[in-house]
C-alpha cells in the first residue's frame, strides 16, 4: 500500500481546506483502486463536498449551530467551546474513501475532498493519503 503524509499549516483560523489537488497528485499514475484520506486528529475531519459556492462557510455555520462554541462541554481545556471540537468526529468522520480509476479521482463534477478544522488552537495539521490498488 502506498502512503504519504501531507502537512498543512492552518494558522489560527477555523475552516475548510480543499485538499483535492494534493490527493489527485498522490494517485496520479496509480491505476485503479481506492484512496483513503485520514486526518489523525481528535478535532478535525475529512469531507467530500462542493467548494467555491459558499458550501465551506455553510458547513462551518451548520457545525456551529449543531455544536455551539460555549461552556456547556465537560471537555474544557483550550479556547472557549473547544469541547465542541472534540464532538466533531462523530459528525464529520476523520476519514473518507474515494474511488480511483486510471490514476484519477472518480469524484462527481462538483465534489472536492476537504479537511474540516473547527479548532483554531492547532496551527498545523496532517492528512494521510493511502492508496490501495485494485
Where are these regions (language model features)?
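Active-site histidine-anchored catalytic micro-motif
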Residues: 1-134
Amino acid at each position: 500500500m502506498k502512503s504519504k503524509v501531507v502537512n498543512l499549516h492552518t494558522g489560527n483560523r477555523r475552516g475548510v481546506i480543499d485538499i483535492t489537488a494534493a490527493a489527485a497528485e498522490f494517485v496520479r499514475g496509480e491505476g485503479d483502486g481506492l484512496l483513503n484520506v485520514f486526518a489523525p486528529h481528535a478535532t478535525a475531519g475529512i469531507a467530500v463536498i462542493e467548494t467555491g459556492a459558499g458550501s465551506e462557510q455553510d458547513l462551518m455555520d451548520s457545525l456551529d449551530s449543531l455544536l455551539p462554541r460555549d461552556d456547556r462541554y465537560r471537555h474544557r481545556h483550550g479556547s472557549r467551546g473547544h469541547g465542541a471540537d472534540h464532538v466533531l468526529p462523530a459528525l464529520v468522520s476523520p476519514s473518507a474513501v474515494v474511488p480511483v480509476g486510471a490514476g484519477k479521482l472518480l469524484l462527481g463534477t462538483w465534489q472536492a475532498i476537504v479537511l474540516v478544522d473547527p479548532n483554531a488552537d492547532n496551527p498545523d495539521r496532517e492528512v494521510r493519503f493511502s492508496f490501495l490498488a485494485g
